[in-house]
Amino acid sequence: MLAAGLMLSIGAGAQTNSYTVSNIVTSAQDSRLVNPWGLSRPFNAKLTENEWWINDQVTGLSTLYDANGTGVELAVTIPPASGGGTGSPTGTAFDPTTNNFVFVTLDGTISLWNASAKPSQPGTSCAECHVTAATIMVNNAAAGASYQGVALDKNATTGVLTYYVANANGGVEAYNAESFSPITLPAGAFTDPDIPATYSPAGIQAFESFLLVTYNATAGGGTGYVDIFNTNGTLLLRLEQGFFNQPWGIAVTPANFGKFSEMILVGNTGSGLIGAYSGKGVFQGYLQSGGQDLVIPGLWGIEFGNGSTESGPTNVLYFNAGGANQTTGVFGAITAN
């Protein structure tokens, strides 16, 4: 049932497993781009502004680039929970109903960048006609929250547009996308009895009416789990175990992405490998380049373009990575050969 709902198949299996990695922007070119985690872009390619928003976890910013590496003057500061120092943005999501962007942080906040908000003295350039700082809407730092991922989808029961947030110290949480008030989920939502209690949510990605959640060991280590739920938090499927190493980024491939078309991709921060899974959750292999498994040190977010000039083709996979020690940064692209 899930495979049919996801509309995934393995029709491209006869093709060669061959992909090319290209760096678009690195921290050597832009010193703000350090250990970038999440990346997001508008859903609608017809919007006038379709750049990628990149969460720079170390520098506390969301910097904007197009698919060719051209930077945008606008950079948005993600505030820290304490009000002082530097923010720590991880996951990010775009709201197509408002054109707003949302950011979650390691120190337990959810912040909003309001696309319609104007600075007190607006100018004519991009950086001058938009506000340059996000606003904290939820601050759960005092409760020990550590937010690592966020996804936007409609709740299956209420139909309310909802932000689902992966709290490494508390499970998956839900917030009304308009008011940011917490939503009470059913008992046992987003839990898997076969995942040890020493694992907690990390990455989260929405696809149609499903939420894909990665789980990593709270003490670190080179394993992990990936589950698929409906938006009420009911467990539907667990991806085949044994091929994860701190999974975080998730993407669903289009029909023209080479050997691994119409599959689920999972990026592993620990190993830098990207694994492909069928709609039934069966492991199909890692993406390769030159006959070897493709490795991107410190890999975080992965996402396909929306077809616009700014965010790139729908069959090009864009990624963020922080390097082996998470002290550098790369925004890049992966194409099928």
Where do the model's predicted regions map?
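Sequence/structural signature of beta-propeller domains
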Residues: 14-337
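Bacterial N-terminal signal peptides
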Residues: 1-9
